[in-house]
Every structure is written in C-alpha cells, then in structure tokens.
Amino acid sequence: MEEDKIRALTTTLKPNETQAQKLLKAHIAVLVSALGGIDKTSEIVPPPYKLGHDALACLKDIKRWIRAVDERQHNYEVALACAESGLVQNDLIIILCQWDSQMQNKKQKTDTMVRNKTAMEKIMLSCLEILVLLTWPMEFGTNLSENQKLLFAQVRKIQVLHKKHILTYNDGQVLKAVIRLALPVIAKTRIDREPRDNQILRLVLYFTRNLLAIEPENDSISTKTNNKRATPSSNLPNGVSPDDISINNLLRVFKKNKVLMLLLTITGSINSEFEKDLFNEICLESVYLLIKGLEAKDVLVNKPTSTTKMNTKTAAAAATTATTATTTTTNTTSSVDISATTPLQPLSSTVGLQLQDLLNTEAKKRQSQKQHIATRHGKFGTLLSIRSADANSYVVSGEEALINSNGTMDKLDKSKTWKMKNHFTYDSDEFVKTNSPIYLNAQGRQILSYFIEEFLSGGCFNNLIESMTSKLTSQLEYSLIDELTQASYFYTIAWFLNYQREQITLSGLQTFDFGVVRAALSEVNFILIVAYFRDSHQKRLWNSLHVAMICFKELLHISNSIFGKKRARTTNDDTIGDDEQYEIDRELAEGIIRKLFSFNEFLNTLVQVPQIAYKHSPRFLAESIRVITIILKSFESFAKEDLQLYVQTKRRRNKKKQQRINELDRDTESKLSTAIYESDEELAQENLREVTRERKLNFQATEVRFFHQNVVTTYIEYMSRFEDLTHEDIKMCLTYFHKLFVVRKDYNGLFRLDFMQLIYKLRNHLPKGSPIRLKVDEFIYYFMKKFKLAITRFPNPLEILFPRFEETRFKHYLSTGELYQLDTAVDPRAIRNLNKEVIDNDYNDAVDNDNNNDNYNEDDEDGIAFEIEANPEAADNHAYDLDRLDELESQLTNYQSRNKNRSSLEKGIAKKRNSRKKSTKTSKVNSDGGDSDDDDDDADAAAAAKAHRKRRVPRDLLFEEPKPLRSAEFINDSDDESDDEKNAEFFAREERLRQLLNQTGNITDAQKLEEFKKVWQQYSKTGGSIMQDAVANAVKEVSLFISDGDDDDDDGNGNENQKGKRKRTRDEADDFDGVSTILDSVQSQVLDNGSSQGNFASDAEVYHASSNTSDTELETNKRAKIDDAEEKEDEGKGEKEEDDNADEDEDEDEDVDGEESFPVVHHKKKRAIISDDEE
C-alpha cells in the first residue's frame, strides 16, 4: 500500500518546526503541484512545461498566502515554503521563458494561442507579481519581528539563489519575457494608457530594481569564548559563485535582453510620455543601484587585466574556479568584445580580480617585511635584555630586534596584551558601499560606460533629476519620501557630477561643459542639498550625512576647478570667445559658492561634522577629511580672487506673544513702527553696518574654526591608518598639519604626544628615498626645532599628554608664557547702555521717593529734576517730516482718549507715574513684532532703541528742518546751566497746568473748543461790563483764542506752520462726551470769582493747556513762571522787577523767541505722562 504524501508532509516534523509551519508548507506544495509541471510524455526535446487546469487560480492563491502571512503577520514562512517547493526555478521562470519563445516564433503560433492570448497574459502577469514579491529587497532593522530576524539570513540566501537562476536560465530570457509584457503599454500614448497599464510597467521596473538590489550579506565572524577562534560563515548559498551574481554578469544580461534600453526610454520621456509621479522614484533607484560602489574614474579608465606577474598555474587555477562556477564562461580568448553574447573572460572574472587584489596585498606586505629582515648571518637566534630606568628588565627574542631601536620596541609592544577599544562604528556606509567589493572587468566597464553616455547625452539625467526635484520640493510628497530615496537622489547627482568632471579632465578640454548635468546645478538643488545636510546632522542620520558630504564635496570640486583654471592665451580672433566662456564658467563657479555658503547655520554644521567624524566608519572619516581639504582650498581661491560672500543669519522672534501698540490693527502698527524707525538716521546707519558685518563672510575667521583641536584629532585618527592610505591621502594630512603649524604658527596645536608618536611611526613605515618620506623628514625637523624651544620654557610640559583647551587664555599662556589680559578698549555701545542704565536707576529712585509724598510742590526743583534726566533730549528739537503719521497719530489719539480713566486722579494733585510698571509695560508693547539678533547685547540695545522711538511724538507736526539725533545728546545732559533753569521753569509751569487740568477736565477736540468759545462770547455779551472785561483780559493774557493779529511778529512761514498745525490738531481730535460738564464748571467758577481776572485767566489757561496739539497755546503756558526764572537769574545783582500784565507780555515774547525748540519735546513729555496716569 502506497504511503500518503500529504499525510507524510503534515505529520513528519523537522527540528525546530511547528505543526502550523508544517501545515503551511503542505498547502504551498499542493498549490505548486497543481500549477503544472514538465510534460514527460511529449516527444519534444527538451520536454515543454504544461500548465494545470486551474493554473491562474493556483497563482492567485499563492499570492494571497504571501500577502496574508508574510506581509500582514510579519513572517517569511511562505517565502521559505515556496523556495522549498522550487516554485521560482522549476515553475515561474520556465513558464515565462516558454511563453516568450512561443511569442517570438511566429511559425508556432496557432489559433488556440491567439484565442487564449488574454488568459495567457493574465497568467504571465501573475507569475511576474509573485516574482516581484519573492525578490523584494529586505533590510535588517528594528522594525522586523523576532521571527523575521531569525529567518533573515536564510531568506537572504534564498533571494540570492533566485537572482542566480533568473540571470543564468537561458542567458536571462526571463527579463526578455517580462519586457515583452511591457511593450504594448509603451506603444500606447499617454492619454490612451489606463491605470492597469501603468501598474504593469511599474511591475517590470520593480522586478529590474529587485535584481539590482539583491546582494549577499556581509561576511560575519563568530567568535567562541572557549578558544577565541574566528570562524567565517559563508554568505552565499550552495551552488552560487560570485560571478553568477556579479555586476559584470548583470550588465551583460541586461544589455542582451534590452533592459538598459527600457530604462533609457522611460527616463528620457518621464515628463512627456510617462507619469513622473509613478516612475521617477523607481528609475532613480535603478540608476543608483547600477553605480553604487563604483568610482567614476573606474568607468572612464581602462585598467589592464593584470597588474602583477601571475604564473601560469595561478592563472589556470583562477580560470578553473571561474569556469566551474558557471557554464557561461567557457571561452578563454583574450580578445575583448562588447557584444552581449560574448562570455566573460576568466582572467577578468570576479574571482580572478579578487585573486589579483590578494596578490597585490601580499606583494606590499613582502616589500615592507624585506626592509626589516636581517641578513642570513643573523638568522641563528637572538635574545636581548633591555633594562629600563627603574631597573626593570625586559627580554626580547628574534632577529627583528637587532635591526634598530624601533624594531626592538615594536617587538616588545607585540608581546603585550592590548585591550584596545573600537573607537569607530560602521553606521554610516549603508548608502555608499555594497556588502561585497565590486570588480568591474573590461566588458562590464564598456557596457556601463556606453549606458552612462547615452543616459547623459539623451537628456535622461536632466529629466529624471528635474522630476525628482519637483517631488522633493512638494511638502505633501516630501513627507512620504523615505531616507533611501533621498540618499539615492543626492548620491546619483554626486556620482554624475564626478563623472563629468573626470571626463573633462581626461579629455583635456579648456571649457567646462556641464550642460548634460545642468539639472544638478539648479538653484533649487542647492537649497535641497543644504537642507539635507543640515537635517541629517540634526537628526543624527549618519548614512544620509555621508551622502550629503559626498554631494557637497563634488559641488565644491567643480567650483574650485573653475577658479583654478587660468585664462587661456590665444590669438586675437579667439580672444573674445574665450573670454566670454571664461566669464560664463566663472559665473557658474561663483553661483555655486554663493548658494552653498549663504547660511550661517550651515557653516556651523560644516564645522561640527569633522569634530565627531573619527567616531564613525573609516569611509565617513575619509570623506570628512576630503571635505575639509576642499573647503580650505576653496577659501584660498576665494581670497585670491577677491570674492566677497555674504552669509544670512537667521533672526529669532521672541517666544512670548507680545501685545500690540494700544491694540491697533497690525497694518497700522506696522506703518507706525516703520515710519518711526526710518526717522532715526543714525540708528538706521548703525543697523546697516551691523547687518553688513554679520553677513559678510570673513574667510580668515571661518578658516580658524576648521583648526579646532577636535578637527586636529580627526586628522590624527585618519592618518593613524597610514598602512591603508595612499601617498596622496598622507600628503593631504601633511598639508593640513603644515598649514596649522608652519603657516598659522599655532605650535601648541600639535604639541601632542599622540601626534609625535604617529609621525615617528609614519616615517619608519614609508620606504626610504620616496618623495613623501622626504616631506615627512622636513616636517619632523621643523617640528622638533620648535618643540625644543617650547620645552625650555616649560620644563615639565604636561600639556602634551592631552589635547589643548580652546579657550583664549589657555592658548595665550601656552604660546607666550604670559597671563591673558582682557582688552581694556572701551566699547561705545557699552558706555551708552551703562549711562542709560544709570539714568534709569536715578529716575526710578526719584519716582519712588516722590510717590511717598501726598502733595506736589510746584516750586521744588529737586522734585522735578528726575524728569530732566529721564528725558535728555529735552533741550533739542528733533522734528522730522514723516509720511502718513498724521493719520496714524489720529488713530492712536482716538484710542487713548476713549480709554482714559479720569477717576484715577484726585482734584488738585498731579501724581507722577509708576515708572517701573509703566516702563516694563511700554517696553513689552513697543517691542511687538521686532526681530532680535543672535547676539543678546544687540537684542537689548535694539529693543531699548525701538521703545524709545515709538514713544516719541511724531515729528511732522512742525515744519522745521530735521536735526539728526546724536549719541552724545542721547546719553549726556547739556553742560549749559541755562538749560537746567529753562527746564525747571517749564516743568514747574507744566505741573501747574496739570493740576488745573485735573480740577476742571480737558479740551481734547476742535468741536469742544468751538463750543467753549461760543459760551465765553455769550458770557461776555450777557454778563455785563465786568464779565466782558474779564473775558477780554483772559483772552489777551493767556492767548486762548488765536486771532489774526497774534502772529504779527512771525514770518510767513510761521503763519503757515501754525495753520498747518491747527489743521492737523482738528484732524487728530476725537469725540469727547464731557463738554457740557466742563462748561458748567467754568460757568460756576466765573460766577463765583466775579471780576477776578487772575482766577478767570487761570481757568482759561487750564482749558487752553488741555489742547494737546496747539504749539501756540503751549508757548502761552510757559508765561506763567517766567518771573521766577528771571528773579533767580538776577539774584546776584539784587534786582527784582514787579511788572504789570503789559510789561510781562513784552518780556515773555523775547523769551519765547529764544526757546523756540522747547515746546515740542516738553509737549511730548506732558502727553506721555498725562496719558499714562489717566490710563
């Protein structure tokens, strides 16, 4: 009785296998069996593959299993079951190749095939879908489940096996069959294509991408704790050789089956015939995987097939190894043919190239050993005893210890047990290198070179980059782009820029033609690279940062090569054309530099990256060293060319949301702030100088930042691997040290024990007589000469054991032996801030003392002295003509008048404002919307200046010549004693007026003034002769109402000014509801006082002074205390004058003419104080 196979599959378990896994594999095996198989009954040789009755349904079921288990449950069980059943190599590949052969051979086409054409295409598409799912590249990361991590290595080997079968079966006919599915889609126009057609084309491109992405894992080393022996584990499955999956075989198969042509077709028409959003990312990744791990010069330069002398046996062994691995490498002719049908050459195969590298490494080691091997007379054994200074003895054996003292100490060091920490991690090479080294033979080089030339000349590169640029600049799509896509974009740009630059260098052309890569040099691309560089550093994405450094380095190389180009000397006919081309190239180079070095934050990132580079992989470290080298070289070129760069410094806004000025709308506040700010000429010029100083890039100051001790440590770490470096790399490090030590004369920067030991080992390693060793010897001689001088000054230099501190005092002390003293130069800005702070402190103390007094003495000069100090500009008139301030001031006045709180003041007492609270509030209000610089001192000064300007009365109220504000007048008070006397007189009169205003109210608009005048005229007519005389004397005494004859002494301009000011006063006034109340109070005072002209005049003076905008009225207010000032001035002479009202008018007219500039400033002070108190 036969055994049931299904029962055996479901009951017999393998080690570490669950029942569910066994059942799943049984289901997949049943589906694969029902799919079809080889028809052994057919007479055709080889026998064809015969599909089952429900082949399409079986393929759909397998696809459902993959998505349901592997994708949704994060497992690889279905993929392993398909590999165990041989689905790919025994079914899918054969089905696709057989269908392609039938479609290609027109003679075998029958009516049955034509009738079943649609069904066969569905089956082929289902096969393609399963192939794409099973070959989808995997990445080992934290997002994998525990089961996926356990099966990751096994599934990776299975994918490598699938790649081998796809490329080797009928010389890659599977790719040809897949492209045949895409041909009908490509033949359609863009309008006629349906979404299903685009999906078919995407499947074809994804399948191509998967083949490029599949590569074996890194060689892993497993160390056992018992014997500490390292056992390498194979990363290739059984039956797969490196040549089967190498880039050479891949390029050959792609060329033969028109895959490269398909890629060129789609990328060349990606913006016209194909949707860029659907195909640009896939095409970009395919191109990126083609060039990943390759150098541009390796594609351009044809290297010889053998660089070392290989004997016949070695070559035959290499050929045998290569031919046994694959059946396609049987032809061993030495001729090179770019035809895709020509098999790979054994001597130039992957195995042969690996053998050549091993032989080259062995030759280098033998050459280094020959320098230290003793003669044949010394090979009889050696035993040395070394006694140290502390009487300890060390024994060294071997003839290597007899060569020199260096060999003796090295032999002694090798006998020690070192526990060296691994200072670097391989966390930054994922996007720039492959898991296994790439060896490109002659045939693969020619195929790839032809593809790249077609890719550039056909405009495919520009189309692809432009489509990806629009996607990266879109905010919605940018969030969906992963890290790999961004890295592939910038790495592709860097690689093709390097390719074009190397091609120009090798061709010897005098012009720099970068038209084929113009999309990479666009302005948008520069913004993207700067943002990508900065974001990668901030997010600590070291793989992305590595790619960003490569792209940034290539851009600098292009600019530096153009700057290094000399103007060609030609005949007169060619001079004009060459000069134009030279200017075009120079403009390109300057544009690159200006766009790259346009942000101060990006410069800070460039300085910070090399300081931590030694903690990462050697490739990352080498790339950072090259970036620093090209930056320093570029700075030298810029300095020679006198190129001026300006760096933009970002201004940060205050975090607190500050209140706007008097709750005005934003537009009005912006106009007011701009107008007042632009009125200050000196401050505007100072701010302009500051912006220019901040933005202009100082090459010397920026260059110093790249000589930080952490950067020096990076160079030392890089050169410590001198055994793996070329002479060019060593020379690059020596150039940096020479610039630091010799050019900049920063001796203490290299007085380090690790550097001394490194330079000594490097000298012994380099071969004698080589040019690089001569340079090392010269540097060591100069270094030791300076070190001896330094050691005499510091007998016990402990500083050489550690890196130097970068503080200025330490650097100064180590360089000169003297203590560092701060610069005693006086900063004018500091003096201005200090004086202002002192004035504010005195002002606050005076306010605190005055707040304790209930009453205010108008004759107390000490009590009002603080207002003179708080307003040092009181003695000057700084009236400027500003536009649109009349309208803005009217809005401001309207708001203040509506929000006055008249209950805060008692009648008869004028309280001073609380300066501490008000000043804080005013500063907050006036600083709204202002930007602050990075410097805290500049921010404070700017905020104080803005607050002072916004509190200033608009200067277009007077038509006078503008007078610039001087710093000395802003800080220091006037030395003239007469100014103090006049100020005291004015503030005494002002306080008196304020008391009267508080008692009777205010006149704030023209309407109320007119009503007030009518009431007074009515009183003068109906009140009798006494009332009429009192009103006439009050008008004459106080100049309450301006008549035509009052301005006889003024010139025409003065009359026009006064008319203009009265007109603006009426425009600025707003409605006030308390007119009737004021008139009642005036009427009661007039009736009570009767014929008292003095009291009536005082009341009139109160109403007159309350008009906040008339200068003539303010001039009249000052006449109240002129007698007191004259008495103080003539006190020494003993003359006291008692004049009547007519004599006072004559004397006061003279004083008013001399004090013409006072009313505006004091009027501003009065308004500010009154509005604050009432508020």
From Swiss-Prot:
Keyword Cell cycle: yes
GO MF annotation list: DNA binding
Region (Disordered): 894-982, 1043-1175
Disulfide bond positions: none
Segments forming a coiled coil: none
Subcellular location per the Swiss-Prot or TrEMBL entry: Nucleus
One annotated Gene Ontology cellular component of this protein: replication fork protection complex
Composition bias, Polar residues: 1078-1096
Keyword DNA repair: yes
Keywords carried by this UniProt record: Cell cycle, DNA damage, DNA repair, DNA replication inhibitor, Meiosis, Nucleus
Composition skew (Acidic residues), residue ranges: 930-940, 1044-1053, 1137-1156
Biased composition (Basic residues): 910-921
Ranges of compositional bias, category Basic and acidic residues: 954-966
InterPro entries the record matches: Timeless, Timeless_N
Biological processes, Gene Ontology terms: DNA repair; DNA replication checkpoint signaling; meiotic cell cycle; replication fork arrest
Superkingdom of the source species: Eukaryota
Subunit field text: Component of the fork protection complex (FPC) consisting of TOF1 and CSM3.
Cross-referenced PANTHER family: PROTEIN TIMELESS HOMOLOG, TIMEOUT/TIMELESS-2
Protein family: Belongs to the timeless family.
Function: Forms a fork protection complex (FPC) with CSM3 and which is required for chromosome segregation during meiosis and DNA damage repair. FPC coordinates leading and lagging strand synthesis and moves with the replication fork. FPC stabilizes replication forks in a configuration that is recognized by replication checkpoint sensors.
Protein name: Topoisomerase 1-associated factor 1
